[in-house]
A protein has these predicted regions:
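Formylglycine-dependent sulfatase
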Residues: 2, 7, 21-325
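Bacterial N-terminal signal peptides
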Residues: 10-21
Length: 325
């Protein structure tokens, strides 16, 4: 992979780093690009393409076809807080989602502008598969909804790709589809649907370096976590195959991101690197693959920079008063 260095703030990120020029790179420049936004849960950049000793061939291939971001961070290592930041472009203290929706925390108002409202106003059909985990839910008027539960038991995982196929087939206009997977949230489950085919044990791995110590229990937790990452990679592969089979892949920007770090020592719920550093890969049609980006932060996180950039590129109104805008 080649390395692109930039002095831009930390997330020249999410959706369309290339600006309006992206439109000329899809197969039909008169069409707005579709957006497939993939979110996995409770995982940092412990993925093969980031150098972790775990087999994630589908995400590795996506990175080889697009851009891998080395310094992507969220403003808070909690599910609801980071997801609200992704969709509003605001810090938790600015949008009000300072705690988990499970505990009845929510945004200050359902009127806060967000990605879903912005893209709907720009003529996009919007859909979500998997949990939203932000309050109030009414603030996000998705046209299509499926599997609204957290699904930590990992039941009927094939339904994620099946519902995606249904949504994409029904979308004659440009679409925004957000797919939220339950892995790698606890409880760590060794295998689901016989995935991974060859699960790891604590004897196969070392503890993740940011833990600071290597203990048999931490090595086992690391193995359990890696098994979740191998499994979610397989499900993401199924999802990308659905997109390819639809014939719309060449007109679709694909974004993959984790919501925050792993639920491990010095990870989730903390402000350590293991809690707030996330993986982020963007693949968009017609651009050179195999790129890596190391953004130098001058304030703001990946989550903040997301919304101002994508709404501008897609022809929707550009949000004002957002961090990094």
């Amino acid at each position: 992979m080649s390395l692109v260095k930039t002095a831009s703030p930390v997330a020249m990120l999410l959706f369309f780093v290339m600006g309006i020029s992206l439109w000329g790179q899809v197969s039909d420049p008169e069409k707005k690009p579709n957006i497939l936004f993939i979110v996995s849960e409770d995982n940092g950049p412990e993925i093969g393409c980031y150098g972790a000793p775990v087999k994630t061939p589908h995400l590795d291939e996506m990175a080889s076809q697009g851009t891998l971001f080395r310094n992507a961070y969220v403003p808070q290592a909690g599910c609801s807080q980071s997801r609200a930041a992704f969709l509003t472009g605001l810090y938790p203290h600015q949008n009000g989602q300072i705690g988990l929706a499970t505990w009845n925390y929510g945004m200050y108002s359902g009127e806060i502008k967000n990605v879903v409202k912005t893209l709907s106003g720009a003529g996009y059909r919007t859909g979500i598969i998997g949990k939203l985990h932000i309050n109030p839910k009414s603030a996000f008027p998705f046209d299509f909804k499926a599997i609204p539960s957290a699904n930590f038991s990992r039941k009927d995982m094939a339904a994620y790709a099946e519902n995606a196929a249904k949504f994409i087939k029904q979308s004659d206009e440009a679409f925004y589809l957000q797919v939220n997977y339950p892995d790698a949230h606890r409880p760590f489950i060794k295998t689901v649907d016989k995935l991974p085919a060859k699960p790891l044990t604590g004897k196969d791995v070392d503890a993740i370096p940011y833990m600071g110590i290597s203990h048999p229990e931490l090595r086992q937790q690391t193995a359990d976590y890696y098994n979740c990452m191998m499994r979610v990679d397989s499900y993401i592969g199924d999802l990308l195959q659905v997109l390819e089979a639809s014939g719309k892949s060449k007109d679709t920007v694909v974004v993959y991101i984790g919501d925050h770090g792993a639920d491990l020592l010095r990870g989730k719920r903390t402000s350590y690197e293991g809690g707030v550093k996330i993986p982020m890969i963007i693949r968009w049609p017609g651009t050179k693959g195999g790129q890596q980006m190391r953004c130098q932060s001058r304030g703001g996180s990946a989550a903040h920079r997301e919304h101002p950039s994508d709404s501008h590129v897609l022809g929707a109104f550009r949000l004002r008063k957002c961090p990094g805008s």
